[in-house]
Amino acid sequence: ITRRMVAEYMLDELQDWRLITSEISSVTDFRTQRRMRFGGYGVLPVVAQGDSYTPLTSPTDQEATFSVSKRGGLETITLEMLANDDVGALRRIPQRLGRAAGETLYRAVFDPLNDNAALTYDDDTTAIFTSGHANSRTLALNAANFDTVIQDMMAQTAYGNSREYLRLRPMFILHVRALWRTVDQLVTQEAQAEPFTTDRNINAFRKYGIRPIQVDYWTSTTKYILVANPRVIPTIEVGFFNGNEDPELFVADQENGGGSTQFNADQISYKIRFIFGVLAPIDHRSFAQGNT
């Protein structure tokens, strides 16, 4: 039963969150987890012949927080329900619970980006996408505007050091259903769908290998967000309790120690439990929103 549940939870379409996540961690308690972000030293000064080395300016730091929480619930079926189940729907309850767990985690990662949630740093609790972060636009998706948003990401500098450019490039584009065709034309087709330059309409974006990720449950018709390479800059952290990345399924019946409830009534109870937490994002510089 557990294997069937986990197989449904691991369906490919529910695993896109892993692509944009930079850290999957093991959390051993329910206390607040603290994550530090440090600035850089920038450009080192020249030391002339015979001169002493001067102290560098120490990088500043920020602290972000998150915690894991339990998610889950109970489902109970009776002997009569099971006997009358002509189409086997009740026997698929474990798979459906696995699907629910997968959907829960999927949305926990993508919801903060959709909702433009507030950051959790000690000195920055503004929204992810703001003019102050230089990562927020309201531009319809086309070649010229796509180029503008990419340049927004390229222009990001390190925390605490405006002279240190992070050299970010988009690796993914998150988008709503309504933009699937436009996104396909921009990032996968050899020729552009609209005039943009004088280079015989060749699609200059294609060489960057930007991968589209369609988020079907987002209700906007215009939203698209660029995501940098999670191996280059921290994006999102997902922490699992004791490193257990799979939901847990428990079955209570007479054979499995169901207790008086199962003894007094002919029924079987399922309990699903899933413990995790999400820090999204770790660094707002890793995301650039083109439209809401």
Question: What residue spans do the PLM features occupy?
Answer:
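Noncatalytic linker/hinge segments flanking ATPase motor cores
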Residues: 31-37, 57, 113-120, 216-221, ...
